[in-house]
Amino acid sequence: MQKQEETLSRLRTIFDIFLRENFSTTNNVYFEKLLTHLQAKENAFVLQAPFVVEWVDRCITAVTEDFKKIHPKVISFMLNLTSFLANNEWMIVRLRELDIVNRAVKLLQREHNLSPSIKLGGIRLMKAITVYSMGLAFLRMHRIWTLLIQYSNNDHTLYVVREARQVLYNMVYKSCDKLHDKAVTLEILSEIMQPIHDNLYKNTDGVERIHVKVDDNEMLHKISSTLDLLSYILQQTLVLEERTTLIILLKEHHDFEITVWKLIDMTHNPYFTEKIFTTLSSYNFALLLHEKLLNPNATEPSEEFTEFGLAFFNLMKFLITRKDGLSFVKLAELNHVLWKKLGPRAPKEIVIQQERVTFENQLICFHMLPLLFSMKYAQKIADEESKIELFDAYVVKLLEISCEQTLRLCYTMRDNFFSADGMAVGLVTAGLANKCIHSLLALENVLDREQAVTVCQALLYVLREAVAMSVITNNGEDDCHSVSSAGSSYLKLYPRGTEQVVNDPQVLHSVMVGLRTLIERFKITWKESVETIGLVNCLAFVLENTSMDARCTVQALKLVQLAVEHFLSPNMALLVDNLQGSALVCLGPIIVKRMHDTMWEVRDTTLELTTSIASISRIKFPAFQRFLIDSKIPPIVYEMAKNDSEVYVRASAFQCLSQMVSINLLWENGLSQLDLVDHLLFVMYRETNDIVRSEAVITLMKIYEHRKIHEKYKNTLFSTLNYCVIGDHHTEVKLNALNFWRREFYRQFSNQGMIDGSFPTVTFSKEQKKIVTLTEKEIQTSIAKVFGEVQQYGYFGILLKCLREETSMEVLEFLIKGVKTMTEKFERYKGIMEEIEMRSPLSDRERPRFDFPSQPQPTPIPQQPPVNPTEADEVIESILNSQDAQLLEKAFETQMQINAQGKTAEKRHIDEFYYKQFAVPLRQFFEELKTIDLDQLVKQHQEWFECKENFTSLLDDILGALKRDDENMISDCY
């Protein structure tokens, strides 16, 4: 209760400051934070405090008297606060008594030059009171929809327009279908439609005629916002579960479809045409849903969509006659989105003119149509029977999924976009092809799998076109990945001119991005699309093009990686022991070449591809192991890890090496001869980049798991690990180093005979080289050996230091989880502590010294005996009188020798006995652990990292900020 009183006291002070006549602030963020806290459930008591409503009353009274008296941010804050109060039914009574809402609405209607934040606050207040029928009646009485239409139509900010449209839709929908007030509904609709009617019709001498004024910018701008508002309202009705009569009112009282169609005569502007057709499409779908699918009195079968289908095809045909390819593709995308909004209410198959079709398939055909025009290469592979059969099968598939009207439109588009002799007239452009692909990718989350496969096949054929075009351009010779071409005869194929589309780098990039997105999203394999079998061949040719830009090269490499991961059948690994005769053979030289590319993005992506190949080669496709060795890739990867100038490339190289070191063939044929361990320890200690150190720890852990590390590195290894846990500032490095320690535990216990977390009754002893029976005493001895070993290397010391000093939440959670597990396991065995102390006692000099110097300690200067003043004078005189010209030269040489010695003295590795300062006995570790509340530690850090601001502290911050603003105002006066 006392805390609430403190909060209210501070808030009352802040509210009083807000109403000062000279109030000004430079920090607007505090208003938003304050509103957020006031809206929270735990602060509901604030809104119930009497002074809050009284402050709102004082504020709106002051604003009514003199608008400029109150700061605009305070007015906006007041309106938002009033909307919070209106959410409480009991507060509505108090608001009515003080006439607050009425005065707020009059303020909004009276003032025209309000700031967007004030308008937004007013709209939110209206939104809050529309929840109540009494509030809706109040807004209706004030004809508030005129203000909302104004906010929706004029040049306002995105937030104002969005909120205004939402409130307006709620008003018109509730008036129509909840209150059944037809008169008010028609009045609102008439107000919305007025800009269209005013500019579309002219009354001359009592005779109504159509007024046509083509491409008047001011008029188009006004009508565009009206069309946007109508489209929003119509599309909102598509998510309703109940039927609304809004659509039939638009149809009967405004002849909506014909009225909007007439706007077409006013413009040749593609942008405005797109707005018109968006509105018409939204209307068609709303009419379909509410007058057919949700109408219980509908007489036609639910699958009969002839009227809807013809309306859709008319829209598409009009855009073809206008030769507007971009709007054509955009309209297909919009219809796809609207169709998906119908959800399960729409049948899977519909009937259009006695023909049963899948509507989404028609949309997909229209999406791909500009791309399909560029498929000429299939005509050149007629001599390859298998390929022409594949393409024929794909064409037949397109014909089967298309209805008659769709095919007619396809031919109409061909005739309009190409001349009679098949020459492109500049309408099928690279920009249009790009839009097709981007439009399809925008529907990635709504496409069915079957449609995604159809699109993927089309993109594969477009990629082949790009390869065929490159053959002609570069006069390439046939090899394992090239295509058969007949030279310039390709360019003469029908239709001519489309080769410029597939030859565009942006189109090629979009095609590869589209393929990768669809294959990843829908897990497409060669079983669904046989065309994917030739994907690597095409990409190999693309990658051999030295003039290819970096973006395309990166996407091609990523697509090759995806093809290797998805399209290699695991069963083939049993039949193939090498890659001879496969297009994959060509990848070796390509990978090596791209590893030396000047662009670091290309080198990095090449390493990702190599990492994937190495991962697959371990089990799934062993033939890749010999592929990597023959191409001499492992040594190149190691050199990149050591010497590449880009940190991301070095990190990727270590990631690649971590996959390679576990493969015996790669280790024995190259990696074992490299100084991997030495360099990794150097990187973990000396590297300045975080991600490189992190990957280096993982790589060293993989080597430690699968290979033997030389005994001379053992002390340095654990010292470096402890340094990474204690001295490194990067969370990932710490976690990887701790994970390394965890793996060391697993390895030690495994060596002692533990299997799946427990000791069996019988095991094979490596020491005695025979099968032995494990007793309780022998198990304790084995555990003692493990704990003695890790105790010696300082594991328990670094745990304690981290628990007391660590600030990273992830590291703490990892540590605490491990400590709790270890404590639970340890309590199962009694007397084990004495066994550990007996087996591995720590000497006094090995006791921990928790000092971690951030800088190396300076070497003390040796004390020299004092120099006699007389001798000093003689030395100075001898130097001054010296004629030795080499004096400075000798001094310079001496300095150079000192610098050289200092440079070589810089150590590559950490002190190998660094670990000893953390060697804590296990008994001391558990005693120290008892003084730490682990759960409280996690809770405390959780509060820090979630940054939960206390409401009272926020109010203190606001008071401090307001005080500083006042001081600044006073200083400005002088």
Curated annotation (Swiss-Prot):
One CC-aspect GO term: nucleus
One GO-annotated biological process of the protein: cell population proliferation
Segments for region (Disordered): 837-871
Basic and acidic residues: bias regions: 837-850
Motif (BRAT1-like motif): 972-974
Positions contributing to Zn(2+) binding: C973
Localization, UniProt: Cytoplasm, Cytosol
Keyword Zinc (UniProt): yes
Compositionally biased spans, kind Pro residues: 855-868
Highest taxon above the source species: Eukaryota
Subunit structure and binding partners: Interacts with IntS9 and IntS11.
UniProt note: domains: The BRAT1-like motif mediates inhibition of the endonuclease activity of INTS11 by forming hyrogen bond and hydrophobic interactions with the active site of INTS11: Cys-973 coordinates one of the two active site zinc ions of IntS11.
Primary role: Required for the assembly of the RNA endonuclease module of the integrator complex. Associates with IntS9 and IntS11 in the cytoplasm and blocks the active site of IntS11, thereby inhibiting IntS11 endonuclease activity before formation of the full integrator complex.
Protein name: Integrator complex assembly factor Brat1
Organism whose genome encodes this protein: Drosophila melanogaster
Gene that encodes the chain: Brat1
